[in-house]
Swiss-Prot record:
This is Galactose-1-phosphate uridylyltransferase. PANTHER family: DUF4922 DOMAIN-CONTAINING PROTEIN (PTHR39191:SF1), GALACTOSE-1-PHOSPHATE URIDYLYLTRANSFERASE (PTHR39191). Pfam families: GalP_UDP_tr_C (PF02744), GalP_UDP_transf (PF01087). One of its GO terms (cellular component) is cytoplasm. InterPro entries: GalP_uridyl_Trfase_II (IPR000766), GalP_uridyl_Trfase_II_CS (IPR023425), GalP_Utransf_C (IPR005850), GalP_Utransf_N (IPR005849). Belongs to the galactose-1-phosphate uridylyltransferase type 2 family. Pathway: Carbohydrate metabolism; galactose metabolism. Its EC number is 2.7.7.12. One of its GO terms (molecular function) is UDP-glucose:hexose-1-phosphate uridylyltransferase activity. It catalyses: alpha-D-galactose 1-phosphate + UDP-alpha-D-glucose = alpha-D-glucose 1-phosphate + UDP-alpha-D-galactose.
Length: 498
């Protein structure tokens, strides 16, 4: 085991290099770290370590376990590591002052500062994110982004038992609330001692900007309401998203829908997602143009994308807000029984929108994906939701990130796809494949046996996985990209002028 003093010196050295602290802070920081380890003396160490940031942090955690300061459990190790890094961080007010000082130079400089801080303080878990499998694969709609999510570690049985028997608390109310800033964490609630948020004014309300601890794409940020209020899609959503992109034109911003099945995983707290990433949907081609009376300054088109999406372009924020709101209101009450689209069942609302906003070539671009959460006997989880035949790949809600063409697939697929590759190489029998994958594996075998002389196996499986994800998205499209669906899509866009 490494010497504690040497590890502390190494972490301080790394943090100075990462601009978390300055040389002047060395003695103070060292003493605060010693206190965490119940030590009240320090002897300089001749040994100079060259460990990486995460290696150093992990060795410090090992010492804390050895000294019985913490349990050897994931939640307590995470809490302790956040306590360590919190020592290196300024208070929220100081971080906000620095952010806006840099914002006066440029919006990008301010987000670069905050993103770097969030990584250097270990709030963004870059070590765990690095475990994800990411690749791009072609499809009939363009190149898709595929991620097999391996970043979130699984809890061990002991930790699950502790969580089951723990006292329930309503503080913080949810994972997004402002009360998470600096929160110690428990066995049931993640550590947030090293968590900081930037205060934003959007549409005369206070919002918070933070980065996701488990990034799915570059600079994946969350914009959350100061108040714990439910998700909603209305005219204020469009105002907020456009206001955010106006303030940070190098970022996109979007919202999950506000209804179950087609919404995100957290419907209880109003929030948006954003970041500095170009998604496959951004490059989707035009399907057809249309116009909306009274909005001559707004370009309108339907795009060729598996989830039925209207794209608006314009320079005037007010016009885009009003045009988006008109489309939302029309869609809320729109039914087309020939395509299984019903706006209401009794008093239950089914229609909503997944919106995204970005700035491109001096114009704002607003993408409005039309969603419907109705269920049926044939499709009890949702008519416009991944159907049973694709559940072996993805059965969870299709939210904003997936709508834009980035698949976030379960970690179990890593081993399961390797088995499928072994089957395609005739190394194992079909019985060794998980039962829910067998129909797909048989289908792949027929294709691969025909193509294998000219096709790389990994590329083949990646492309087929991408195609399966495209099927997931196609199931969610309310207007299918066939003759009947296109006619239906045009009936809806025509209704915008009635």
């Amino acid at each position: 085991m490494y010497n504690l003093n040497a590890l502390i010196d190494r972490l301080i050295e790394i943090s100075i290099n990462n601009n978390l602290i300055e040389d002047m802070d060395t003695v103070y920081t060292r003493n605060r770290l010693l206190s965490l380890f119940n030590e009240n003396s320090y002897t300089p160490c001749e040994e100079k370590l060259t460990l990486s940031f995460h290696e150093t942090l992990n060795e410090l955690i090992n010492i804390a376990i050895e000294k019985k300061i913490i349990e050897d459990a994931l939640y307590s190790k995470d809490i302790f590591s956040s306590d360590i890094m919190n020592i290196f961080l300024p208070t929220p007010s100081l971080i906000n002052k620095e952010f806006y000082k840099r914002y006066a130079i440029s919006p990008k400089e301010s987000t670069d500062y905050f993103y770097s801080l969030s990584k250097s303080s270990n709030y963004i878990r870059t070590d765990r994110i690095a475990k994800n499998i990411n690749f791009k694969a072609p499809s009939k709609y363009g190149t898709m982004d595929i991620t097999i999510n391996l970043s979130k570690p699984e809890k061990d049985p002991k930790e699950i038992a502790l969580a089951r028997n723990s006292v329930k608390s309503n503080y913080p109310k949810c994972l997004l609330c402002i009360e998470n800033e600096g929160y110690e964490g428990t066995v049931t609630h993640p550590d947030r001692a090293n968590h900081r948020m930037i205060r934003l004014d959007l549409n005369d309300r206070t919002w918070m900007l933070q980065y996701s601890p488990y990034l799915y794409y570059n600079e994946h940020c969350i914009i959350l309401s100061e108040d714990h209020v439910p998700m909603k899609i209305d005219i204020s959503t469009f105002k907020n998203l456009l206001s955010f992109v106006d303030k940070f034109p190098h970022y996109f911003a979007g919202s999950n829908a506000d209804l179950p099945i087609v919404g995100g995983s957290i419907l209880s707290h109003e929030h948006y997602q954003g970041g500095n990433h170009r998604f496959p949907m951004n490059d989707a081609k035009k399907l057809f143009n249309f116009s909306i009376d009274g909005f001559e300054d707004v370009e309108c088109e339907a795009i060729k994308w598996p989830i039925s999406t209207i794209r608006l372009r314009g320079e005037n924020i007010d016009s885009l807000v009003l045009a988006s709101d008109l489309i939302l209101k029309k869609w809320r009450d729109y039914s087309d029984e020939t395509l299984d689209i019903l706006a209401y069942s009794n008093s239950e609302m089914h229609n909503t929108i997944t919106p995204m906003v970005r700035k491109e070539d001096g114009k704002f671009v607003v993408d409005l994906s039309l969603r419907n959460n109705r269920t049926s006997k044939e499709h009890p989880l949702g008519i416009f939701h991944p159907h049973e035949e694709v559940h072996h790949i993805k059965k969870e809600n299709i939210g904003l990130i997936e709508v834009m063409g980035l698949a976030v697939l379960p970690g179990r697929l890593l081993k399961e796809l390797e088995k499928i590759k072994e089957y395609l190489r005739d190394e194992i029998s079909l019985d060794n494949i998980e039962e829910y994958h067998r129909p797909w594996a048989l289908e792949l075998k027929k294709k691969f046996d025909y193509l294998k002389s000219s096709t790389d196996l990994n590329d083949f499986v990646n492309k087929e996985l991408s195609n399966k994800f495209v099927s997931v998205l196609e199931h969610c499209g309310v207007f299918k990209l066939n003759e009947e669906g296109l006619e239906g899509f045009k009936r809806f866009t025509n209704s915008l002028n009635s």
